[in-house]
Amino acid sequence: MILRLLLLFISLILLGSCDKVIHKNGARAQNALDSMIEQYSYPENDNFTSKRVNNKEDIIGNWVGSFNVPQSYMNAYIFDDGRQPWHIEDKINISIQHIEENRVDGISIIAGTIRPLKGTIQETENGFDIILVEPGREQYDGTYHLFIDSRTSMIRGTWLAYKDIVLKERNLSLKKRFFNYNPLIPMERVSIRNDISLFRNIRMRSEYRELYNAIKSHSQQVYEINPSISIIDPYEAESLSGNDLMLLRNIIFAKHGYAFKKRPLRIYFESQPWYIPVSTNVKNELTYIEKENIKTILRYEKYNEYHSDY
């Protein structure tokens, strides 16, 4: 009898402790959410606007747009090694970070890879001519020849590889974009496209094909759950498919401007108008809510993977 009472007493203490932890974490998450709503609730996100270029200072910032091969390269065969851009890429980011007299410094962000840039700038009658060079140590390094038209505030130009790679030339068309982390911004429903050369001209890892199929078969819940502002509880996570969990986890990283190496994820998020690749490491930028959700999602992804083997 005494033993039973003792066990009951211990159980009540443990339940009380758990309840305090739950309330403490819940309050912490709610405080984080309230702070986010106050901070990020504004009518329009700055990164949808494009700034006029009137002088060199206006050029500093992120220039985002297409990085595509000329038509003559469209049927070329390539192997996706996780570093090379494909024939068609929707979003390259040429980030101009510093201009001093006629010298320019910055970085290029494409296909989950960041490369340093150095070069020169020359003012012309209708804009600015810019030449930017990558170091040349990597297989896919090259030179950018760009023109900023002050009448349209757009960059157009070309990229030429140093080495004799399969896709040696590229055309660029870029607009200035302003990156702002906004956890409240919703996901838009998009369908992942199949490039003309997707399976015919590309040799890729088997995991990429699986990833394409996963992205194409997610549910409506991906658009209803915002993993940056609300805690995903175990009951909710258990009801989600492995595909849903994978996308929700990566939505968190995309909102921080993570530059995806895996092309299926890249083209999915590049279809979102708010997405801008700015970094290959955003772990230090994650909020408390996002970190908690990533832990939960990873746990249930492993659970789904384990049970799919049986």
Question: Which sequence ranges carry the predicted segments?
Answer:
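Acidic/histidine-rich, surface-exposed loop or edge segments in extracytoplasmic proteins
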Residues: 223-234, 276-279
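Sec/Tat-exported extracytoplasmic proteins
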Residues: 67, 71, 249-252, 256, ...
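Sec-dependent N-terminal signal peptides
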Residues: 5-13
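Positively charged n-region of N-terminal signal peptides that target proteins for export
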Residues: 1-5, 20
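Beta-sheet ligand-binding and adhesion/scaffold domains
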Residues: 22-79, 83-93, 107-113, 117-206
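Amphipathic alpha-helical packing elements
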Residues: 236-277
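C-terminal motif of bacterial Sec signal peptides marking the signal peptidase cleavage site
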Residues: 16-17
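Compact alpha-helical subdomains of small soluble proteins
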Residues: 260, 267-310
